[in-house]
Amino acid sequence: PIAGSMVLAAILLKLGGYGMIRIIQILPSSKTDMFIPFITLSLWGAVLANLTCLQQTDLKSLIAYSSISHMGLVVAAISIQTQWSLSGAMALMIAHGFTSSALFCLANTSYERTHTRILILTRGFHNILPMTTTWWLLSNLMNIATPPMMNFTSEFLILSSLFNWCPTTIILLSLSILITSIYSLHIFLSTQMGPTLLNTQTEPAHSREHLLMTLHIIPLILLSMKPELVM
């Protein structure tokens, strides 16, 4: 069920990161070196999860792997134990909670009309549901951390913290950000552009779907205007 995926991505997945933040506070802050394996594996795992996203043909699986890649950045940031990295990790968990939940909601919007999650079969929605295309565009822009969204603020804090800790990490971080932009653009073009393959009449977008997306986008925009509330 799509509701389960939304709750899993927005709340349950982030509880693990929040638990790490709480546990890390009781450990000596000078023992950052003991977390080097975790930082390395989390960054490498984020890159591999992003590469897996490029191979996915199932829309729901693609969004799920996207959540895994973002949590890799969160784990790396928490392990460094600096003020900037912890603030960035907390902000990214909240921002990506809204973003991934919105993407799952949009994926269900497409599934209810096409009864498939295969990307190549869900194309052409720009001509059928133009307002939904706007929601897709905003959600993908948030997913790639476009300014001035809180996603950008959080990823900038994490990137700065990791680069200050070890400049070599910029290689994996840059690769992860690049691949995220590629598959986010791939999602948008695959679902919205091109000729539609639907032969039956498609029902228009419901007000409940627009309300759901509004309740995802507006709070994130408001938090982006005042990010110190969660950092």
Swiss-Prot record:
Core subunit of the mitochondrial membrane respiratory chain NADH dehydrogenase (Complex I) that is believed to belong to the minimal assembly required for catalysis. Complex I functions in the transfer of electrons from NADH to the respiratory chain. The immediate electron acceptor for the enzyme is believed to be ubiquinone. It is a multi-pass membrane protein. Its EC number is 7.1.1.2. The keyword Ribonucleoprotein does not apply. One of its GO terms (biological process) is electron transport coupled proton transport. This is NADH-ubiquinone oxidoreductase chain 4. It is found in: Mitochondrion membrane. The gene is MT-ND4. It comes from Causus rhombeatus (Rhombic night adder). Pfam families: Proton_antipo_M (PF00361). Its main location: mitochondrion.
